[in-house]
Amino acid sequence: MKRLAELMIVVMGILLGAPTMAAQEWSQEWARERIEKSPRHSEWVTVEHDGRKVETLVVYPESKDKRPVVLVIHEIFGLSDWAQELADELAAAGYLAVAPDLLSGMGPNGGRTNTFPAGGVMEAVSKLNPDQVTADLNAAADYALKLPAANGKLYVTGFCWGGGQSFRFATSRGDLSAAFVFYGPPPPQDMMPRIKAPVYGFYAGNDARIDATIPATISGMKAAGKTYDPVTYDGAGHGFMRAGEAPEAIDANKKARDDAWNRWKTLLAS
């Protein structure tokens, strides 16, 4: 009986803890704390297009001059606390960061990422219509470029699922200055000739699924006469930009994040 009681306690603990563990797909307390301490102005705006309302985070740099726009595409975990903190970090570096929640209107009662039940975000993101995603991104970019603080220059970046979307976005957006793809898959090779902007890749050494796509991407982009510059960070795992700044980050992810961030800032400033 005692053993049965102990087992029941363990089972109940797992069941009660499951929502908390699953909720971490979009919730990072350490990232939220950093956002709350940020001195930069941020605001939520509703970007409307084609009957859709896309809730979008805009974070402004502390600058007297007009600055480039960086369109941020979130991971498969939705517009998480970390994605919002990353937008703030871009603003700290001097860029007008715009991060649309691509799950806007898709959650319970028409909510966005933070309204989904535990474990529901990844499935919802994976089912998003690619054309809807592109339309949402175009609308957010168009909105941002019209802001008085914008200087007309547009970059796009994405992570994980969003990395793939940033690469895909480059096939349809002709006014991009550059696309920054963090550990995301490439678009089909027959779409690569449409790309006009240089594409810079950031990949993890311990990410066989995505790394396996790099050789064909190199050859496909070369055949299309496009600029593609991938860098792989040894020892890092998929998602190192987020994992590398978490309190429990391993050294390889920390180093990869630092090196990638320095490279990224250099490219943005070039």
What is each PLM-predicted segment?
Residues L7-A18:
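Bacterial N-terminal signal peptides
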Residues A31, I35-S38, W44-L145, R242-E245:
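Serine-hydrolase catalytic machinery in alpha/beta-hydrolase-like enzymes
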Residues K222, T227-S270:
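C-terminal catalytic histidine-bearing segment of alpha/beta-hydrolase fold enzymes
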Residues I195, G201-Y203:
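Short beta-strand/loop motif that positions the catalytic acidic residue
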Residues L137-K196:
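Primarily recognizes the serine-hydrolase "nucleophile elbow" in alpha/beta-hydrolase
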Residues L86, D211-M221, P230-Y233:
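Short alpha-helix in the alpha/beta-hydrolase fold that links the catalytic acid
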Residues L102-M106, P185, A236:
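Short beta-to-alpha linker loops that shape the active-site pocket of alpha/beta-hydrolase fold enzymes
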Residues N206-D211, H238:
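Acidic catalytic loop of the alpha/beta-hydrolase fold
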